[in-house]
Amino acid sequence: MKNKLPPFIEIYRALIATPSISATEEALDQSNADLITLLADWFKDLGFNVEVQPVPGTRNKFNMLASCGQGAGGLLLAGHTDTVPFDDGRWTRDPFTLTEHDGKLYGLGTADMKGFFAFILDALRDVDVTKLAKPLYILATADEETSMAGARYFAETTALRPDCAIIGEPTSLQPVRAHKGHISNAIRIQGQSGHSSDPARGVNAIELMHDAIGHILQLRDNLKERYHYDAFTVPYPTLNLGHIHGGDASNRICACCELHMDIRPLPGMTLNELNGLLNDALAPVSERWPGRLTVDELHPPIPGYECPPNHKLVEVVEKLLGAKTEVVNYCTEAPFIQTLCPTLVLGPGSINQAHQPDEYLETRFIKPTRELITQVIHHFCWH
């Protein structure tokens, strides 16, 4: 029953008060089960059918799919339930207590992105879901902040094919139709240790890595020359050398050296293509020193994403907002949802607040976000 649904601000408060941190470090990682239960109960109260999906390979994490209406197509509204960890020493407020001050709602997940579910639930108060002409789906995913395991698993297993989807990440209500991907690798070189007084008796891994880095930087230049997408502020794939470590003493021949690097590919570039380019770049080192160089993923890769600029979803949202779609450099779950249907990234709050101490969402987003959600539901599910 709709009258059982708490007021908007109390929904928001309950979501923020329910910790659901994702972290690669097991001691910090938390289940999102309690948050999923909250959402599931509220959507059931609104007349939705609810399915809770355990996500394999995670520490007790779940997706939730709430659905209402019959037939094919329809609209999917999606978002993630998890947050990043927080630095207790840098927050001036309790991260798990929603605090309103000076036109801002403070709390961990207010912008990125638990608040989106509060907006959806509040907008649905005024929607008669029994009269939907096409189905409406609400997807809440797990582990976006680490592996994106929830969105990956949902996209791999669902039979749903909505007409379109909106992911409510904080874009300041500016619609995003494309973003770059992310690939991170560890390059490891195994040398042979020995006393530095006789270099010929060992194989110095740092020297081999120096050779490998030269080839990697040549790949960086080749990517910049070969691939372009002018809509991006940085209109080519970037390659960054982010971390390196090797050796343990100045008088020992270095036995092992490890380099961490990332590539941010443009939409349309395949992960297999990029892996092939990296392997080709490192081939001279591998051929000269067989068995000493390995390449491993640091995190599951995220492909680039693009929604066709002439799709109906783009046209409708641009008309409703009076704003053109944009492209951005950060990553979301959009590449995985895009395998099901055309997808936009669009939500309240600023990406500049994501992952920051004293995270907040400005209250000026409340009214236009509620109106936008109502409008897109009416457009894609009532006609």
Curated annotation (Swiss-Prot):
Sorted UniProt keywords: Amino-acid biosynthesis, Arginine biosynthesis, Cobalt, Cytoplasm, Hydrolase, Metal-binding, Zinc
Co-factor binding details: Binds 2 Zn(2+) or Co(2+) ions per subunit.
List of residues binding Zn(2+) 2: 112, 145, 355
Recorded metabolic or biological pathway in which this protein acts: Amino-acid biosynthesis; L-arginine biosynthesis; L-ornithine from N(2)-acetyl-L-ornithine (linear): step 1/1
Main localization, broad class: cytoplasm
Transmembrane among keywords: no
Subcellular location: Cytoplasm
One Gene Ontology cellular component annotation held by this UniProt entry: cytoplasm
E.C. number: 3.5.1.16
BP GO annotations: L-arginine biosynthetic process
Catalytic reaction annotation: N(2)-acetyl-L-ornithine + H2O = L-ornithine + acetate
Catalytic machinery residues: 82, 144
Top-level EC class: hydrolase
UniProt GO molecular function: acetylornithine deacetylase activity; zinc ion binding
Cofactor(s) demanded: Zn(2+); Co(2+); glutathione
List of residues binding Zn(2+) 1: 80, 112, 169
Family: Belongs to the peptidase M20A family. ArgE subfamily.
Subunit annotation: Homodimer.
PANTHER family per record: ACETYLORNITHINE DEACETYLASE
Function: Catalyzes the hydrolysis of the amide bond of N(2)-acetylated L-amino acids. Cleaves the acetyl group from N-acetyl-L-ornithine to form L-ornithine, an intermediate in L-arginine biosynthesis pathway, and a branchpoint in the synthesis of polyamines.
Protein name: Acetylornithine deacetylase
Organism from which the protein derives: Escherichia coli O127:H6 (strain E2348/69 / EPEC)
Gene name for this UniProt entry: argE
